[in-house]
Amino acid sequence: MTDAHTAGPFIAAIDQGTTSSRCIVFDRDGRIVSVDQKEHEQIFPKPGWVEHNAAEIWTNVQEVVAGAVEKAGITRDDIKAIGITNQRETTLLWDKNTGEPVHNALVWQDTRTDALCKELGRNVGQDRFRRETGLPLASYFAGPKARWLLDNVEGLRERAEAGDILFGTMDTWVIWNLTGGVNGGKHVTDVTNASRTMLMNLHTMQWDDKIAESIGVPLAMLPEIRSSAEVYGEITGGKLGDLLGGIPVASALGDQQAALFGQTCFSEGEAKSTYGTGTFMLMNTGDKIINSYSGLLTTVGYQIGDQKPVYALEGSIAVTGSLVQWMRDQMGLIKSAAEIETLASSVEDNGGAYFVPAFSGLFAPYWRSDARGVIAGLTRYVTKAHIARAVLEATAWQTREITDAMTKDSGVELAALKVDGGMTSNNLLMQTLSDFLDAPVVRPMVAETTCLGAAYAAGLAVGFWTNTEDLRANWRRAAEWTPNMAAETRDREYKSWLKAVERTMGWIEDEE
C-alpha cells in the first residue's frame, strides 16, 4: 500500500535493463512508491556472444508492471502516464504479422559483429560514419547487429525487404507490445535510442539513407523516430490492457540518457556517471554537436516534445559492476557483491596490483576490441584483498580517463560528478573516485535515476510536471565525497594504471 503522505496521482516507469526488467511507481516529488523487478536469462552461445530472449523479456515486463501497480495499491485512474527506459543498442528483429522474434536479441555487449565492423571500415577506418552519427564503427551499436541477423537468418533479408520484419531496440519492442502488438502496435523509437543505431544522422535527427544502405539495413524495417517525451500511444490489449488500458505511453530514453535526465543535468557542462553492469558517463553539451577527438561518443542527450534536441558527450566502460559479479561467481573470492567493500577496506592500498577488466575489449577512450583482461604488478605480497581493491580502483581509473577526455573535447573542467547506479552504495569506491578525479562526487536521494528520468519525461509529456525547473526542485543530495589524496600519489598511481592498460592491447590477433 502507498504511504499516507504519497497521495496520487502517480507516474510509472519501466526499465528494461541488461539483467532484469523492473517497474517503479513515482509520486509528484519524484519519490519511489513501489518497485517490482524480475531477472531474465543471459544466453552465451559462444565466447563473446550474448543474447536475450525477447519473448521472455516482454512476459517479465508485463509481470513487473502489474506487480508494481499492485504493490502500490493503486488503479489505472491513479496513473497519469508510463515511461520507458531501456538497455541501449540491444537489437531485435521480429515478424510484424505474428509478433514473434526471428532470433534472440543481440545484446549490446555481444561482439560477433567485429569482423563486419572491420569490413565496413576497410578503406576509411573506424570513423567512417562518425561525422553523421557521432559513433565509431564498433560491435557495440545496433546497425551492424541488424545486418548480421539479415545475413545469418535464412530468408530474413527477403522478408525484411517485403516489409514483413520490424527492427527495434528494446524501447521499440516494449512500446510496440504495450500499444497493441500485432493489433496496431506503434512502431516507434526515440531520438536517444535512434542515436545508438549508427543509422541516424545527428544533424537531421532522421535515418540516414546512405548509411543504412552502406551498412545493408533496409529502411522499410526501421521505426519512426520521435522525441523522448511525447505520447506515442496508449496501453492496449493483452494482460496489461485489462489492468491499465488507456494509460498514455509517453516517454522513451536509452538508460544512460534517462539517468542524465533523472539527475536533472539540464545545463551545458553538467555530467553524471552511472555505475551498473558497465559504467557510462554523459556530459550535457547543450545544442552543440561536439565531435570527439578523444575516443568519446557524440550522442543525443534528450529531446522534450518539439523543443530542440540536447546533445551529450559519452564515455562508456564495458566492465565495472560485472567485474564484481565475476569475482563472486567465477572466482569465488567473495560471496556477495557487497562483501567486496569489506574485503578491499581491510588493506590500505592495492599492494602494487592493477586490474584492467578488458573482458570484451576496451571501450572509451580506446575502442580496442583486440584487448583482453590483465592483472599487472603481481608479487607474492598481493592478497585477495589487494585484488578486491584493484577491482574497485579499475572502475575509478576508467572514469578518470573519461573525464580527462571530456575536458579535452569540450574545454569544460569537471566541477563535480553526480553518480547513480547500484555500485554507488559502495562508499570506498565513491571515496576512491573522488580521490582519483580530484573533484567532489555527489549521490542523490533517489539512486534509481534511470527510471526516474523516464518518469520525469513521461510526466512532462502529459503535463504532470510543468517544466524542467519543477524537476530540478525535486533533486536532493544524499551523500557527497571530497578528494583526500596527495597529488603526487594520484599522478604516480595513474601512470601505473596507464601502463597496465597498455599491457591489455593486441592480445587477440586479427583473424584474417
Curated annotation (Swiss-Prot):
Sn-glycerol 3-phosphate binds at residues 18, 88-89, 140, 255. It holds the Pfam family FGGY_C. One of its GO terms (biological process) is glycerol metabolic process. Glycerol binds at residues 88-89, 140, 255-256. Pathway: Polyol metabolism; glycerol degradation via glycerol kinase pathway; sn-glycerol 3-phosphate from glycerol: step 1/1. It catalyses: glycerol + ATP = sn-glycerol 3-phosphate + ADP + H(+). One of its GO terms (molecular function) is glycerol kinase activity. ADP binds at residues 18, 22, 277, 321, 422, 426. ATP binds at residues 18-20, 277, 321, 325, 422. Disulfide bonds: none annotated. Its EC number is 2.7.1.30. InterPro entries: ATPase_NBD, Carb_kinase_FGGY, Carb_kinase_FGGY_CS, FGGY_C, FGGY_N, Glycerol_kin. One of its GO terms (cellular component) is cytosol. It is an enzyme of class 2 (transferase). Inhibited by fructose 1,6-bisphosphate (FBP). Keywords: ATP-binding, Glycerol metabolism, Kinase, Nucleotide-binding, Transferase. Belongs to the FGGY kinase family. Key enzyme in the regulation of glycerol uptake and metabolism. Catalyzes the phosphorylation of glycerol to yield sn-glycerol 3-phosphate. This is Glycerol kinase 1. It comes from Streptomyces avermitilis (strain ATCC 31267 / DSM 46492 / JCM 5070 / NBRC 14893 / NCIMB 12804 / NRRL 8165 / MA-4680). The lineage of its organism: Bacteria, Bacillati, Actinomycetota, Actinomycetes, Kitasatosporales.
